[in-house]
C-alpha cells in the first residue's frame, strides 16, 4: 500500500480506537511555539488540536486548520492534499505527525506521517473581532477561528471572478476624496478579504453571487465566521459557515424621464475600438457585446447631450458607435456626433453626441494646446424651439497611471497631478476665449482627479460647481472604484448660474459597483447596461429655455 493510502486507511481505522489509547502520549509541540518560531523548521513534529476548518477536496486549500484550547488560542494549517474531505470534521480532536515548515511565511505542518483521531471535542468558539479596534490583533490570530459580529460592507469585487475573493470593510464603504488622510493607508485597519477556501484562479462557479449573478459593492454581510490567515499581502478569512449577504445596494433604475428639461450626461465607453486586440475588444464577439451594452446605457440615460470619453481616435470608430446606438432608437431620439479634426495624438479621443431633433448645433471647437494629450471638444447648442445658448465641453484629463520616475510623480494626489492641474488651467482659458454672448459652458467628462485635489480646487476657484453634488449624499458621490476605494473622477461642472437651473441630477451606478467579469470582455458578460464600462455616468437635468 502506498503512503497516502496507508494514511487514509490508518485514519479510518483509528476512528474506532478509544481516544486515550492513541493520544495520551506526550512530546507534542504547542501550536503557539510553532507559530512563534521556537521550534526549528524542517524538523519532525507532533501537534494536537481541535479541527476548526476543513478545506479538503478538489480545488480547495488542500488541508485543514487545527487550534489549541488555550486562551488566547493559537491555530495552524495542516497541509494534507490527498486526504479525502469526508475523513475530518470540525470539532474533532486529532494528533498529527509531520514536518514543520513555513510556506510563504505561513507556518504549517506538511509531509504528514500520521493522523490520529482523538475523538470529538466540540466545535471551537470563534474569537470575536471588530475592526478597526482589533486590527492590531490580526497577526496573532492567524490560523484561528474568528467571527466578525458587526456588519461588513463589500468594498471591492475586482478579484471575485479571478480568485473568488471580496474586499470587505467595517463602518461602511471606503471613500476617496483626495483630501489629506483619505488615502489607502487611512483605511487599512478597516479592511479584511473574504476568500473562498481556495487560492485557485478563475473559480467555477464564482462564489458569493446573488440571484442576478452579481455581488455589488455596498452589499453587506454580518456574523462572518471562518479561519483567519494572511496571504498575498492581505489578511483573509476562509469561511467555515456560508456567508449571508444583504443586498444593501441593489441595481438602480435608470434616471427618471424628464421630457421638458435638457439632460446632459457623461459617458465613458471604456475603450470603444474598432481595431481589435488593442485597448478595447479582442474579438468581434466582444465588440458586439460592447455595442449592446453601450446602446442599453444610452437608452437608459435618455440624454440630449452626451460627453463621450475613451473612443478610439479614428473617425470610423465614432461613426460606427453612433450608428450602433441609433439602430434601436426612434427617429426623434437619434444622435449625431461632434468631433474635431484636431483630436490630439492619443490612442483615444473625446466626442459629443447630441439629438438634432431637440438641439441645434451652433459651433464646435477643440482645445489644441499641447498640454492636452486628448483635445477637449466644445459644442455650442440652442434648443430647436429657440432659447439661450449652452456650451458643453467634453474633456478627459491625464490618468494617474504610467507614472514617471522623476518630475510629476505621486505626491499624494497620484502622478501627473501637475499636468492635470495645467490642463484645467488651459481649459478655463480656452473656454473664456470662446465664450459667446456670455453663454455658460458645462465641463463634462473624466477629470481623473478626486474632489479635493488640485485640478478640482482650481476649477472651483474659477466658479465651477459640481452640478450633481446637490442631489447626492456624500456616500453616493463616486463614479469609479480603485483598490476598494470609491471616488468621483467624472464630473459635470458649470457656473452657479447653471446650477440654479438644475431640476434633477445624479450618478447612475451601473458600472463601478459591478464585478469586472460582467463586462464585455469578462468571463460572464451580463446583458443590459451592467458593467458596460468601469466608470459610472453622471447626468443632470437643466431647465433651459
List the model feature ranges, each with a label.
Residues 15-20:
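N-terminal signal peptide c-region/cleavage motif recognized by signal peptidases
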Residues 21, 236-349, 405-428, 439-440, ...:
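N-terminal, active-site-proximal structural segment of metallo-dependent hydrolase catalytic domains
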Residues 21-277, 283-297, 327-329, 359, ...:
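Extended non-catalytic accessory segments flanking core domains
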Residues 64-67, 96, 146-148, 193-194, ...:
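Structural recognition of the beta-strand scaffold that forms the well-ordered cores
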Residues 71-73, 84-85, 101-104, 199-201, ...:
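Solvent-exposed loop/turn segments at secondary-structure junctions
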Residues 216-224, 228-249, 314, 356-383, ...:
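Metal-dependent phosphoester-hydrolase catalytic domains
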Residues 317-398:
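Structured beta-strand-rich core segments of catalytic domains in phosphoester-bond hydrolases
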Residues 386-388, 394-417:
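Active-site His/acidic residue clusters
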